[in-house]
């Protein structure tokens, strides 16, 4: 079959001085960073949905892209054509992983029977493509938000029949993920929230969502799926308020239903922006709570109130993110999935490459800066100094539960305590980070 991206062999590393827009300037898969290959640190993935399913439509305009697999025709044939182009893209971009929703890769059909038959046929196609290309599945998931049946949610829907349909999709998608060697399975509650409290029973919906997640965990163990289950937090859009608002909110939810040891988090940069947080904050929070799993690498626009899903281009922002990830030991089953799309006006098919190449170079530079921060150790040293008092006898007695509140009150009085505030040196630390970023 004729190549779709016929003007490109494969994207390769050419170094920082290259002027070739279809080459990497900073991402060298085999370069060692802290003793580990760059590819193994970053674990890049390209997503199926934005890259091959979006037709360029928005709230104010119809599809702007001319994609052969999006033209009228027999649905399964077009899905197979899309898979051909997708794996050509993954191979030529030189990414080790990809991600999908069930209906990204397969026609949904008019019934559950059609859905399952179509998906089974396309999973065979994907398995063959993976074997041929060497590209692996980072994670799979089920789209339980696009079809009109999910207008009031999937797991939180007031109709248990909709809940059951969603369960069928998750069962099918998780089993497909297992068969394809997927390393994670993601749960994103696109419509698990509310538009108005006037018709919403918050306690009922929370109980439904908790039971659904418990059943997902049960099914994972039943089928022997060895990957990681991930929830992807988002505060709103398409609903007014979503129950998986941010990392801290999801932690509280998981604790309530006894799932904090079973499910981790897939953190998206743009969702952090929508929640009023920095990307750095959400990553650091997930790590502090023991829930860090994977990353959807993109960026939002702080001046806009919706999910713009742009490609990451800030080394400053992502260096701090990679610093937290490296300190925590790096990715295990997770990776950096580019949940990002070209702009509607970017109608050249090679714009897909320009967006991903720039993003991969950005994350490679961020990794190198983070490695310098780790190797130098100054930032870590200053944080340790700031909290060093907690290593004292008093600090340890407090943390180990050996002193009560009244014991502490007596201690303060007996020792005539008069502590003096110590500078946090924020400006110094910000300058230190700039040193890592910009000084050679």
UniProtKB/Swiss-Prot annotation:
* Superkingdom to which the source organism belongs: Bacteria
One annotated Gene Ontology cellular component of this protein: cytoplasm
Matches recorded under InterPro entries? Xyl_isomerase-like_sf, Xylose_isom_bac, Xylose_isomerase
Catalytic function, reaction form? alpha-D-xylose = alpha-D-xylulofuranose
Report the EC number(s), separated by commas if there are several.
5.3.1.5
Q: Which cofactor does it need?
A: Mg(2+)
Disulfide-linked positions: none
Regarding protein family, the annotation reads: Belongs to the xylose isomerase family.
**Amino acids binding Mg(2+) 1:** 232, 268, 296, 339
Name of the protein in its database record: Xylose isomerase
Residues reported in the UniProt entry to bind Mg(2+) 2 = 268, 271, 307, 309
* Gene3D superfamilies in UniProt: Divalent-metal-dependent TIM barrel enzymes
> What keywords were assigned to this record?
Carbohydrate metabolism, Cytoplasm, Isomerase, Magnesium, Metal-binding, Xylose metabolism
Q: Which residues does UniProt mark as catalytic? A: 101, 104
Q: Name one GO molecular function term.
A: xylose isomerase activity
Q: How does it assemble?
A: Homotetramer.
Q: Which organism is it from?
A: Escherichia fergusonii (strain ATCC 35469 / DSM 13698 / CCUG 18766 / IAM 14443 / JCM 21226 / LMG 7866 / NBRC 102419 / NCTC 12128 / CDC 0568-73)
EC class, as a word, reads isomerase
An example GO BP is:
D-xylose metabolic process
HAMAP family under this entry?
Xylose_isom_A
